[in-house]
Amino acid sequence: SGTGFSGNAEISQISATENPTDKQRTGTATIIQNESGKTATISLSQAASVITYENTITANKTTLTFAATAGDQVVTITSTRQKKLNGKNSGSPTTVNTTGKVTGTGFSLKTQSGANYTVSATENTNETTGRTGTLVVTQEGSGAKSITINLSQPKATVAYTYNLTSNPSRVEFVATGETKTLSISSTKQKTVNGKNSGSPVAVNYTTTVSGTGFSKGTTEYSVVAAVNTGTAREGSAVVKQSEGTKQITIMLSQAAGTSA
């Protein structure tokens, strides 16, 4: 008798099933002599099982990468505890609650909903340095384990928008010759993460004049037309910025001379 014990009278064998508890089990075996009816009682004992628990924590992502312009990222955590009986799994794993902590400039833990952690990053306006941080998720209770998810955000994206215009786009000269100033606007606008940063700044440019009777003046924004004694004539002034790829063409025309 006794939980977990059984016998085979024919061969005087007593068996014990695995003890599912962490306590010793006891029982008795009674042997009865068929002819005399005499009995003998044997005490039985079974050692307590070794019960342990193994914690496991994993994440569906090891790194969260954010845009420089800010944003949210979600990571899903799997956190379990497995009961082991004498070194073997016993039953199914159970869920273990977790807590999270975020470190790193610009990063914060926005929400935790069950196994899902949402991390936020503010805009990084630093033009030379990216940002890094961590999300450390730790199990609650005994045997707790932790997992670290790396956080990464690049440096700000810096770009320039170039503008080059002339008003008017066609300049006319009298036949007797004259010098005219070109009305040119040459600027660049800095953008950080796609947004304007500061005011536009001037960009140098060069002017190339072509056409009979036309030449560049003493500055990049002046054109000289010589005296024209013949038929009307045309030329052009090609203006190129010293940065970027912008260029414009200004048409030049001069009236015919009186002798034409």
Positions of PLM-derived features:
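A short beta-strand micro-motif common to beta-rich folds, especially ectodomain repeats
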Residues: K23-E35, T129-G141, A232-E243
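Residues on the solvent-exposed faces and adjacent turns
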Residues: E18, Q33, Q46, K61, ...
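Extracellular and select intracellular beta-sandwich modules with Ser/Thr-enriched
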Residues: K38-S43, A144-I149, G244-I250
